Curated annotation (Swiss-Prot):
InterPro entries linked to this entry: Asp_de-COase-like_dom_sf, Asp_decarbox
BP GO annotations: alanine biosynthetic process; pantothenate biosynthetic process
Localization terms from the record: Cytoplasm
SUPFAM superfamilies xrefs: ADC-like
The gene coding this protein: panD
Cofactor-binding details, from the entry: Binds 1 pyruvoyl group covalently per subunit.
Known role: Catalyzes the pyruvoyl-dependent decarboxylation of aspartate to produce beta-alanine.
One Pfam family hit: Asp_decarbox
Cofactor(s) this protein requires: pyruvate
Lineage, broadest ranks: Bacteria, Pseudomonadati, Pseudomonadota, Betaproteobacteria, Burkholderiales
Residues that coordinate or bind substrate: T57, G73, S74, A75
Keywords: Autocatalytic cleavage, Cytoplasm, Decarboxylase, Lyase, Pantothenate biosynthesis, Pyruvate, Schiff base, Zymogen
Protein name: Aspartate 1-decarboxylase
Associated pathway: Cofactor biosynthesis; (R)-pantothenate biosynthesis; beta-alanine from L-aspartate: step 1/1
GO molecular function, one term: aspartate 1-decarboxylase activity
Amino acid sequence: MFRTLLKSKIHRAVVTHCELHYEGSCGIDEDLLDAANLCENEQIHVWNINNGERFVTYVIKAPRGSGIISLNGSAARRASAGDLVIIAAFAQVHEEQVPTHQPKLVFMDEANRIKELRSEPQNPPQTSPLR
């Protein structure tokens, strides 16, 4: 049996621009693609932290070192420049490999530079900050 597990995540990237009249896709700085183990044309999920929108599109390469995160085509209606997004990809992992599977987690700063790289999530807080 195979399970669908998180493969890659770019966390809190800033949308740099949106191009409505462009073929649908998400342009991502090639340095970020390498860090997150993503490739051109790979299916990705984009979750907009600012407005709660969630959608699926695919990757196109943006120039290396540019910091570009662009939403194109109909995806451009789902975000605005300056919005924070999470970009995720999933993989089919054989049941036997599940215990050793480690996703690539890329945490961004406000300028779309890599702040931290991890291969496993941190434990969630044990108490709610709202209490």
